[in-house]
Amino acid sequence: MPFRVSRRAAALLGVACAAAATFALAAHAAPPIKVTSQTPTDGPIRYTVKVTSSRYGNAQQTRTLRSGDTDDFTWRTTPPGGPVPAVAGCPGYASLPLDANGAMVRQTQVRLAPIVAANGTANVQLSFRAQAPRGTRTVTSGGQSIKCPDVAEHTEVVRFSMPTTGAPKTVKLADGTQITISALR
């Protein structure tokens, strides 16, 4: 007996095939989805700053910054021979890093000012300033001889480019201090 299809079943089959073809064409016509793992260049970036110095000590800290922001990293540490007493008559007394007892300690300051380009490269300006006592010296103040800290200090500004992929960038300053920075989105 031959297989017969009713008109109604044939019509439904035709509608179903037409609908399936329409949906298939619509699926192929949709725009592709672009997946990217990059974040906007002005988004927060984690910067880790590590200072290695025989004179000013070692320190490390991580902070989050946006492109165009600046941040100051400041570390105070006890020098190898201990803090050096300072009195108000010492030259530059107001700018000396002092502990709670009024004795000079080591201080390292790093100001980081990154600007991230569209390609993800950070153009960084780094300002470095450090002070440390290296013993004492005798000075005359108000007609009296007083012992003051013999201050070693270094100030330097460097500019450089670095990736924001977490790869470290090391900068060597004129006094031998090394600063290693990494930036990660």
Regions found by a protein language model. Give the residues of each.
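Bacterial N-terminal signal peptides that target proteins for export
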Residues: P2-V15
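Outer membrane pore-forming secretion/assembly proteins and partners of Gram-negative envelopes
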Residues: P2-F3, A29-R185
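Bacterial N-terminal signal peptides
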Residues: L13-A24
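A general, composition-driven signal for non-globular sequence regions
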Residues: M1-P2, T22
